[in-house]
């Protein structure tokens, strides 16, 4: 029944969805929005692991978008997100543990379609499921798409480092959503034995963390990490102190023992919590001994995880525009001389949690003795892209490829609709591939794609969905995408996809050998000084 208001069962009750049509295909899609996968994390459940959702009677309405989790909406400012329209007004609430499902209208219990679960990005401090519309992917590729939400910022990642607030609650929310999918997705025509998790930016970090977490084992069977992995210093820390100290001060709860601090924070209103959480542009997950038994670096190095087939990739200009504007508040169009650059390098090494003395080594490596301000800025951007995105992604690919099939890509196409929205020298910026994965921009808005771009989007969707179906992105009518193995071949994703080899191999040497050696030496000298 290709019904206009489909009703499906879940283990907590029935839900009614709606029928949507996707331009360019006859396939209808059933959408079920705002299904609860956990109990609202309110009151005593603030800073606690998620609890199972409660049952409801009657049929729940699944036709409107769920509230987003608490976040700083000012950052989601339209300029930065390149929105040329006003996003739908979506309420914000601490009660935000909901997911959206997009399933082909013909899908029935027993259809056994592959399932793709999207984890949104946003530095673990912002974003929402509803920014991403899964209907095109569902319609064109005959897969069930699920987009999930998780607690953000302080509410999702504050930790006292002990049992009073263990931290990673946002990650535990994601695990709860994946468990919900295992239990219920068959009712929507999905196959719980064929689940791929995919995400971009902090969503990629999340996916990468699930690959490493013993808690998530068996909840998914393939992983796609777009632009970020579990190794970005700003998104993972071994110690909860930095965040908890800031929170203790901002909340005026003071430097008290953890039990008192958590009690004090639980008594704060939603508005007060929002004011505290808005301070963080990024917030790190923490090595909690449960979700992450050890630091991701160690888990990867020791191969102490259950590998799954993976696609890992980056864009060719990750630090082109949106990230420097958000994180360093610098305008990449401003030219700076070497001295000014040195200052910025100093700030940047701090952000990357590297010893400040390494700034000069990085300048030598990336800028040589060049004095041209344009060149200096471009090289600074390349260095930051390498440090935050490219090198971590390559390292994870190298560490995973010996355990499970791994495919690597570099996305190289600059979307035509951005040409008036940012400077001409920006290539494929952070987040640019997402438009092609979903064939729509944020909140499902149609952006004008050229015919070639439509084709590129169909290709990207096909690679991603083939991977969800067969753990291998290759298929008829697509340029061959080789495994990332000893010869380090990868796919250059653009209008004419081609195979590349050994992406940035020399730089990888620099980041994995030269730099750590220098860090050791510097720490050694510091050691000596302290001893003297």
Swiss-Prot record:
Glycans are attached at residue 249. It is found in: Endoplasmic reticulum lumen. It comes from Oryctolagus cuniculus. This is Cocaine esterase. PROSITE patterns: CARBOXYLESTERASE_B_1, CARBOXYLESTERASE_B_2. It catalyses: a carboxylic ester + H2O = an alcohol + a carboxylate + H(+); cocaine + H2O = ecgonine methyl ester + benzoate + H(+); 2-(5Z,8Z,11Z,14Z-eicosatetraenoyl)-glycerol + H2O = glycerol + (5Z,8Z,11Z,14Z)-eicosatetraenoate + H(+); prostaglandin E2 1-glyceryl ester + H2O = prostaglandin E2 + glycerol + H(+). Monomer. It holds the Pfam family COesterase. The active site is at 201 (acyl-ester intermediate), 318 (charge relay system), 430 (charge relay system). InterPro entries: AB_hydrolase_fold, CarbesteraseB, Carboxylesterase_B_AS, Carboxylesterase_B_CS, Type-B_Carboxylest/Lipase.
